[in-house]
Amino acid sequence: MIEVLFGESEAASMKMAKGRGTVVRSLGKTEEGSVTWIGGYPGQVICLGFMLDIGDIKEPVDGQYRRDLIRAMYGQEQWGKQEEDADELKASADLYTAELERLAEYIGQGEPVRIWYSDSPYSRCGFYFLCNWLSHRRADVRTVKLPEYRQYGNVIRRYRNWGEIGPEEFAGFLSGERRLSHEEQSMYANAWSCLVEDNSPLRAVINGEMTGVPEDFYDFLIWKRLTGKPVKQARLIGDILGYDPLGVGDWWYAARIQHHILQGRIKVVKDSEKLYARTISLA
């Protein structure tokens, strides 16, 4: 079974979940004992982290525009990553194209595909894109959609994306696995075509629907928390992510903050080589 995910963190967790003394098979059926790990090996995990909720999606996903956009997002000096880590992240822009080619090879060999997606914009867009991409290929496709929440005893745990799930937890969600019908695949493929035709700078989930929105759509969250009182950029972004978890990455808010600094709406009170370490306030 080939596992497809749309973010680096969740794909890394899935790789850890694969091949740990398999007890789980397709559609959540178990062979023996407790349901803990997902069968197979790490090489059966495909990461398509194209960030399709942002930017021009009329441009091909394997084109230079998408590569440059991904590098621009990953290439920010955010938390003081080591240089080799930053280089690895930038290289991901090229690796995603190779991952898509690898997926095509697996499908050509008759391997079934299981898509793990959520309602986070990057994941929903990735799922719609993939359904469109699969429309000209014969494939056995299953899906596992991340539920809004799960109850564990008297505790409710809410979820935003698969990146929040530990390697040992993935198998517990296989009860939600279902086959994707041809009609459903066509519906989602058409949804992607509509988004491409619209081609807004951003895509967001509004009232349950994936919708094209302007580039400044999430900026109100910055203005909601940024005041004339200086604050570390890391703290500001952390508060936005913590209090308003809309499935948007920290790098997007960092990019928008930088945009408003250049426009003179936000000022740098105390600069730093590491963007997230600098102190900022309203201009």
Task: Name these PLM-found stretches.
Residues 24-28, 64-76, 154-179:
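Acidic, Ser/Thr-rich peripheral helices and adjacent loops at domain boundaries
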Residues 157-231, 235:
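A conserved mid-domain beta-alpha-beta active-site/ligand-binding segment of alpha/beta enzyme cores
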Residues 28-52, 140-152, 252-254, 269-272:
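A generic structural motif
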Residues 12-17, 57-58, 123-131, 153-157:
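A short acidic (Asp/Glu
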Residues 75-127:
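Long, hydrophobic/aromatic-enriched structural stretches that serve as scaffold segments
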Residues 129-143:
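A short alpha->loop->secondary-structure connector
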